[in-house]
Amino acid sequence: GYKAKTKLVSSYAWDTTIAFLQKVNSDYGSSSEEGNYNDTTFSYTDITGATKTKAEGSRVLVPTGQTTPVCNIYDMGGNVWEWTTESYSDTDSPYAIRGGNYSGGFAVYPAGVRTYSSDSAYDSYGFRLTLFM
């Protein structure tokens, strides 16, 4: 199985995240599948623990690849809040973060929760970079 020895990228504000992603895109180009995404939904209520992240509620940032894979996808929720391109209506912040983080519990931060603070950078804020091959 997949055993990454790294942690998710964290401590980035929205503008720093976008600058990094633009640099990566200019270095590697884009693919024909650039618009694809994982649309699998899941909840944190599975009593077997199969859909719970190891990091959620652990109070520490956990290395990637240590969760139980669901649909062969690792670390799709929890650990760090992830920046999205979704707008957060009724606020001054143009972008939303979602997914919960390591400092909260399952009941506090389910996968669908969104919040905002696009000018902030905390160790619990991060992003996911996907490379299509």
Regions found by a protein language model. Name each.
Residues 54-61, 81, 105, 125:
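Extended alpha-helical regions
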Residues 1-75, 133:
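Short aromatic-cysteine micro-motif
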Residues 23, 86-89:
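Short, well-ordered loop/turn and helix-capping segments at boundaries between secondary-structure elements
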Residues 75-76, 124:
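Residue-level recognition of short, solvent-exposed, well-ordered loop/turn junctions
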Residues 77-86:
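Active-site-proximal beta-strands of protease catalytic cores
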Residues 4, 9, 67-68, 90-133:
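Disulfide-stabilized, aromatic/cysteine-rich ligand-recognition loop
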